[in-house]
UniProtKB/Swiss-Prot annotation:
PANTHER family: 3-DEOXY-D-MANNO-OCTULOSONIC-ACID TRANSFERASE/TRNA GUANINE-N 7 - -METHYLTRANSFERASE (PTHR23417), PENTACOTRIPEPTIDE-REPEAT REGION OF PRORP DOMAIN-CONTAINING PROTEIN (PTHR23417:SF14). Gene3D superfamilies: Vaccinia Virus protein VP39 (3.40.50.150). The gene is trmB. It comes from Salmonella choleraesuis (strain SC-B67). This is tRNA (guanine-N(7)-)-methyltransferase. The lineage of its organism: Bacteria, Pseudomonadati, Pseudomonadota, Gammaproteobacteria, Enterobacterales. The active site is at D144.
Length: 239
């Protein structure tokens, strides 16, 4: 796996462009298990960043609906979803290599073959590698809420990002978000509702019950015990 997780963008004069990122690089120390997984399973399941669009049929060796998960953490729920739906293809993106290693180890242990992972900036991957009208589902679960007001602009869910996701979804594809931060849920709802081309799948036009397809994480279980809420939002591409 290459170490160039984040490639700067350049202007017409070749100068690097600065753009606000929605994450902080916290690479952390790899455990021996994570290191072993990166060395041994990355060649099979890992995808290097490329400037060229990916061909999903070639990448997965078959034609099947593709779900993209952005920021899969340690990968437990992503692996569980891929194992539960072997008829679908899953691509996960995570910027922190310990999480990528943990996901690879878990996928290998569970015998999951319909999963590929990347260690790169998801926005750049969407721009450069994901073909338009190619995804059946985009998942964004528990992104950093950047709860301080001065940091709100760092939240990944902003109008340009949501419009980018829209362009990558097939007609009828769904953008599924979840957060345990109510103010961020309200922000997500406001952003998504402002974009022509999305339809809110909530009967009350706000949030949906957690679908069975999204596993409950340990983090989420702990939150429930402490009385914390979780908000799911699902928006379908309709035009």
């Amino acid at each position: 796996m290459k170490n160039d997780v984040i490639s700067p963008e350049f202007d017409e004069n070749g100068r690097p462009l600065r753009r606000i990122r929605s994450f902080v690089r916290r690479q952390g120390r790899l455990t021996k298990g994570q290191e072993h997984a990166l060395e041994n399973y990355w060649p099979v399941m890992g995808v290097e960043f490329s400037e060229a669009p990916v061909d999903f049929a070639t990448l997965f060796g078959r034609e099947a609906p593709v779900t993209l998960e952005i920021g899969f953490g340690m990968g437990a729920s992503l692996v569980a979803m891929a194992k539960a739906r072997p008829e679908q293809n899953f691509l996960g993106i995570e910027v922190h290599s310990p999480g990528v290693g943990a996901c690879l180890a878990s996928a290998h242990e569970e015998g999951v073959e319909n999963l590929r992972v990347m260690c790169h900036d998801a926005v750049e991957v969407l721009h450069k590698m994901i073909p338009d009208n190619s995804l059946s589902m985009v998942q964004l679960f528990f992104p950093d809420p950047w709860h301080k007001a001065r940091h709100n602009k760092r939240r990944i869910v902003q109008v340009p990002f949501a419009e980018l996701v829209l362009s990558k979804l097939k007609l009828g594809g769904v953008f599924h978000m979840a957060t345990d931060w109510e103010a961020y849920a309200e922000h997500m709802l406001e952003v998504m509702s402002s974009i022509d081309g999305y339809k809110n799948l909530s009967e009350s036009n706000d949030y949906v019950p957690r679908p069975e397809s999204r596993p409950v994480t340990k983090f989420e279980q702990r939150g429930h015990r402490l009385g914390h809420g979780v908000w799911d939002l699902m928006f379908e591409r309709v035009k």
